[in-house]
């Protein structure tokens, strides 16, 4: 995924289907400079992590 698209999804305030390693995630924040996204897993909201934006897939 492109960094700008990830940032738009994070700021939209709506649920957009995004996958990371085959699991549904929510993008909380995007660091454009580092090209990293703070995500959490839909089925495990307590599991937050920072991941490279390029590894996210919009469905």
UniProtKB/Swiss-Prot annotation:
Iron listed as a keyword: no
Gene Ontology CC: endospore-forming forespore
One GO process term, biological-process aspect: sporulation resulting in formation of a cellular spore
Cellular compartment(s): Spore core
InterPro entries: SASP_SspH (IPR012610)
Entries under Pfam families matching the protein: SspH (PF08141)
Swiss-Prot/TrEMBL keywords: Sporulation
Regulation: induction: Expressed only in the forespore compartment of sporulating cells.
Similarity-based family: Belongs to the SspH family.
NCBIfam families membership: SASP_H
Record protein name field: Small, acid-soluble spore protein H 1
Record organism: Geobacillus thermodenitrificans (strain NG80-2)
């Amino acid at each position: 995924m492109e960094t700008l698209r990830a940032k738009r999804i994070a700021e939209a305030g709506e649920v957009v289907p995004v996958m990371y390693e085959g699991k549904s995630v929510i993008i909380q924040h995007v660091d454009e400079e580092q090209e990293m996204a703070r995500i959490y897993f839909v089925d495990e909201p307590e599991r937050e992590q920072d991941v490279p934006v390029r590894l996210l897939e919009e469905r």
